[in-house]
Amino acid sequence: LQILDLGQIPLLAKDRTEDDPLVIGGGCCTYNPEPMADFFDLFYMGEGEISFYELFDLYKKMRAEGKTRHEFLHEASKVPGIYVPSLYEVTYKEDGTIASFEPIYEDVPKTIQKQIVLNMTEAVYPEKPVVPFIKATQDRVVLEIQRGCIRGCRFCQAGMVYRPVREKNVEHLKELAYKMLKSTGHEEISLSS
């Protein structure tokens, strides 16, 4: 929220105009997006790589056609894994839990299915990551080797959220590592999972 404030972007999605950027949420926090729903225009439910290009192409098309922000958000809600809070009526019980969750338009999905990348080797991954102009603490390439965890500890949200375990092909990882080192000038690789 501080980033929005510093960027002079209205904090509440309902207060944003056609001139304001879209505020999109994703990652682990989207498994319970309601506490932050008033601040976001839309959320990716699950892993964003699945619907990123479809959403981006829709955005470009609708901008070219002169469509409004609301019209875009309405159409975006039909992209698998996209949750647009402004298109749902949510009521709460006295204890703060959700009593009902209903779309306000008939063509908006009643439920949003989280999206999962099943083949990590085919998943989009930056071969030429942005390199900061200043000295960074993590002055190395970050290479994602897998998602998921075989343990599934009950206290660990990430271990449960990113199931099932999915690994990238070793040859593909070698190719990515070479390209990323060459394009960034870094000399070290941090393996991420």
For each predicted feature, which ranges?
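Generic, low-specificity signal for short hydrophobic/alpha-helical stretches with a mild N-terminal bias
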Residues: 18, 25, 34-37, 64, ...
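Ferredoxin-type iron-sulfur electron-transfer modules and their immediate structural context
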Residues: 84-89, 93-140
